[in-house]
């Protein structure tokens, strides 16, 4: 109650303060801004009095959770002058501000009067605040931003929409992702992530890439074949897809002013500042048509199917399969009727086939997940029992052989799920009579690659086995093996630890053998990769 009364009193005092000098006030309603690293707060109004700058803040956050405004918060004008925060009205600085049921709230922040003639200001909680709120380029003189200067490389090249998709080659080499964060400002996140979906393993980790002071960035990677990547500048609202290919450069420009506009409470319906990202590189036309592609898939996919879980597992599995097949056919028909380029159509037909195959592979798990959602409070034993029942009911011929043919098509490697299929190759090949082809070669390469990733260098026998693989696969494996050997040699030179050999023991006796050397002592044991 005391907190509510204090907040109410502060709001009244603030209103009196503003009303007392209203004739001299200058008010900017819903000012446009350049960029923001948050959707939790936005400036809804700026009031310039003869002595203060008051920001009305609209807050939007998860209901019953809190946000906080640090006492280190300050404004910086267009000449570089700083104005430290003086007080909050309706919010106490450095204290938790709990969001109501609606998830929306308003309060005011008071700063010194900005310099006369200021064109804009930046808002920051300060570099010392981890995850602090930052808003750049809040406009005071205009309801428009300065013109966005587009690099020449960003201008789309003319392409023939009738050209078919260039068949991805299985080759090895360095691929480069480079580009620029447009409108990059001091204080913006100084790194972004590149997430790689390797045709051999699927998700292959993400890499932090530093951003230079002018907003440019560049990263090179060893890659086998054409791979799907995500350039992720998450705090600034940019998440864009690119393709990388050995020997080629993938160039991407990130438009953070547009990314911030579409996330804005007050400006998302306003005039666009262009695309969120621009791309030049492999499969350029597919990326250029990405928005149309996403809209087409969303419209043709249809509603999420529901199931009567009182039916037998065999019936549920057949209903699920029919729904997935029907969905794929609807999407293929939509693709054929679309005005997309032939390259995008070729890419999409491969993508649809891969998504269908992946969906059928995961049928027991997906149905179990829907069953769990329908039941809501389900304990783990019931969940696992249902999942086991679905797996047992899965017939051997559930996935038609014709659907597996896509795995031997090079276009399949462009899909992010291809690497996951390669990881499951042993299971797929045991369950189905797979024809020899691209997939079996990638599966053999993948098995050797996983060993290297598990810190096991290639043996002489494996190197001999490797000779049956395409040259690109051999080059990739040898390069990864050399990296591992170099790492192992470097680790041998480290000190401060001792490696103990377990010796030749049966699997069931391994742990007992390891700890036997330390009998009577306290041990910290770290178990990992137990699956």
Model regions and ranges:
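Oxidative protein folding and maturation machinery
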Residues: 167, 256-521
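Conserved redox-active cysteine motifs that mediate thiol-disulfide chemistry
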Residues: 519, 523-531
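Low-complexity, acidic Ser/Thr/Pro/Gly-rich terminal tails and inter-domain linkers that flank the onset
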Residues: 25-50, 87-91
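C-terminal motif of bacterial Sec signal peptides marking the signal peptidase cleavage site
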Residues: 18-20
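Solvent-exposed beta-hairpin/edge-strand motifs
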Residues: 67-88, 128-138
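Short, well-ordered beta-strand segments enriched in hydrophobic/aromatic residues
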Residues: 52-61
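A non-transmembrane, solvent-exposed segment enriched in polar/low-complexity residues
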Residues: 89, 137-342
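Short, solvent-exposed, Trp/other aromatic-anchored flexible loops in extracytoplasmic proteins
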Residues: 84-129
